[in-house]
C-alpha cells in the first residue's frame, strides 16, 4: 500500500518561481482517445463492411500493475508537472497516516 499526501513541498520549474513551493498532488488519468486520430480512422475504415476482425487482438499481457503517475500543480504559479512512482498494487492519495503500534484493520 502506497499512501501519498495531497500536498508536497518540491521544486517548481515555472518561470515565475524557480524555487521550492507547495504543490497540489493528484493522480494522472489517461484522457479519452480521439476518434479523429489517423490510426483510429484507418482502423475503423478497415473494420467496416464484411470480413470480421482485421487486425490482431492483443492477449499476451505481461504486467499486473501500472506505474503510478502523480500530477503536481504549483500553488503559486499553477505550473504543472508529472512524476512517476514505482509499480504498486494499491495506491492511496491523502489517506490516514500510520501510527506506531496501531492494530491493523481492514
Curated annotation (Swiss-Prot):
Residues 36-56 are annotated as: Disordered. It holds the Pfam family Ribosomal_L44. PANTHER family: 60S RIBOSOMAL PROTEIN L36A/L44. Belongs to the eukaryotic ribosomal protein eL42 family. Keywords: Antibiotic resistance, Cycloheximide resistance, Ribonucleoprotein, Ribosomal protein. GO terms for molecular function: structural constituent of ribosome. This is Large ribosomal subunit protein eL42. It comes from the Eukaryota. PROSITE patterns: RIBOSOMAL_L44E. Confers resistance to cycloheximide, an inhibitor of polypeptide elongation. One of its GO terms (biological process) is response to cycloheximide. GO terms for cellular component: ribonucleoprotein complex; ribosome. InterPro entries: Ribosomal_eL44, Ribosomal_LSU_eL42, Ribosomal_zn-bd.
